[in-house]
């Protein structure tokens, strides 16, 4: 759901007020190509995204087959790299940090809602499993969004979905190659804990460096 964010556009004379496009998939990398296309400016180099100018004019538009999203670290610079590739029907998530011991940290875990869930989980086994999963996630996740739009049931071990999972793994690897994603080696070595631990250690070192540089910058002000 965090990736299913509405894009609201107001363009008098072009975009029909109140019009809703609920089947088109766009992402942040598509914004620049679209603006350049509207202004008839040729991109100086190959861009990752694609223009959805035709969509704004109400014309048929063949958008991307998948949307690829990623998360690197929280606001406190705690490395929690995650990658997701999805379409309208399925979503595949790769979380190299999820080793069963490293705990997910974010502002959401300190809020009233999560604390209420933790209290209720004491006497509710279903909720207890949900809380545990939220805190530790899984190395791989796969969801059938047609049947499970809230992504509550991880199907990564379900043999009935093995063909679809294979397709999405391949699609994610391709996106990683195209974008120069630094998680590519970790993804290809996802069954090797040493490779994953080395990747997370490197990402945490990078995050710590960013945090230290930010602290020094603030102290100079």
For the regions a language model picked out, list residue spans one by one.
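Substrate-binding rim/cap in mid-to-C-terminal beta-strand-loop elements of soluble/periplasmic
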Residues: 1-46, 50-63, 153
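A generic secondary-structure signal for well-formed alpha-helical elements
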Residues: 12, 38-43, 56-60, 89, ...
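C-terminal cap/loop subdomain of S1 sulfatases and analogous C-terminal strand-loop tails that border
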Residues: 32, 39-141, 216
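Single, functionally critical "micro-switch" positions that shape active/binding sites
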Residues: 5, 88, 143, 147
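Long, internal low-complexity/basic segments
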Residues: 123-140, 145-221
